């Protein structure tokens, strides 16, 4: 993913030429998966996740956001309350490396040049592109066929506040609806592996990143006016 970091640096340098305020920071949290293997709990961070992010604030209500996040996702049928899954006993492990670009919207004005303490809920969506392992299951054992790429639709909700004049702390939960049904090995793409399909092949898999972001703000005071 060296090209991802090069893209991040290029975007960062180009945006600093403008007068809007910027944010750059880190994400720390956990990940979980929702699909055809293991429990169906929606928010159960079970593996560490980390990332970097950049925001270009165009107004007190909205910002363009770019991020890179990576994590491992795992699940085990033995942790499921569904008898059919717990008896089956499948488990898997996959690696997710994601870049995402989209729009973040604040429910309340969040003018970073006003020094008083501010707090606001926010939502984010856009498009994500990620790398993962194409898996398949044979004789109860999960194997890797190849490294693959896919898209996902991120849907993030969170709440944030400025803890100092230059630092913003946020808590967020972000689900990703992936355009693949094979994060878990249940629906391999290869024709020769189609007989190994299991589960509901009409529903795609989801993965979730939950955690904290800490961003540093900088840039000239903007004019929030119609362009």
Q: What positions do the PLM features span?
A:
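Residues on the lipid-exposed face of transmembrane beta-strands in outer-membrane beta-barrel proteins
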Residues: 26, 52-56, 101-105, 125-127, ...
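Outer-envelope beta-barrel architecture signal
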Residues: 20-24, 60-64, 97, 115-121, ...
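Short glycine/proline- and aromatic-enriched beta-strand/turn motifs that initiate or cap beta-hairpins
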Residues: 19-57, 134, 209-222
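Bacterial Sec-dependent N-terminal signal peptides
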Residues: 1-27, 218, 227
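Gram-negative (and chloroplast) outer-membrane scaffold detector with strong preference
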Residues: 60-62, 66-137, 216-218
